[in-house]
Amino acid sequence: MASRMGMVAIVSLFVCALAASTSVNANVWQTDDIPVVNSNMVRHSNMERQQQQGGFIGHRPRLASFNRASNQDGDRKRTVPSGPDHMHHSIPSHTPQHPPVYVQALYEDDRSRTSSGPSKSIGPPPLSDRY
């Protein structure tokens, strides 16, 4: 069992190493840049590196920002609409416009409504005089 687990670990490491060596992102670790003091040269070398890595020339999409919205709006709170969204929560046309009428069900245990005899009072049982 231990030899089988060792074999699985070796094969998985081999697959990961193979995937890392053939992926496009593998050349991120292979940088041949020489440190440059001039800021124009640094910007130029960064542009060249970005174009070489992905083959992408032009405007790069902006990454998502996780800054709070209050920082962008001058520290004022965002207005949030209250109440239901009428576009998604409209009243369907097939529902009746009047409230439903509920009919009270008659039960066999309710003798006060089904019979005309004396009604049975509901309450605690009478105390016995056994003291």
Swiss-Prot record:
Transmembrane segments: none annotated. GO terms for biological process: cell-cell signaling involved in cell fate commitment. GO terms for molecular function: receptor serine/threonine kinase binding. Glycans are attached at P84. The modification Hydroxyproline is found at P81, P84. GO terms for cellular component: apoplast. The keyword RNA-binding does not apply. Residues 49-131 are annotated as: Disordered. It comes from the Eukaryota. Residues 1-26 form the signal peptide. Keywords: Developmental protein, Differentiation, Glycoprotein, Hydroxylation, Secreted, Signal. Belongs to the CLV3/ESR signal peptide family. This is CLAVATA3/ESR (CLE)-related protein ESR1.
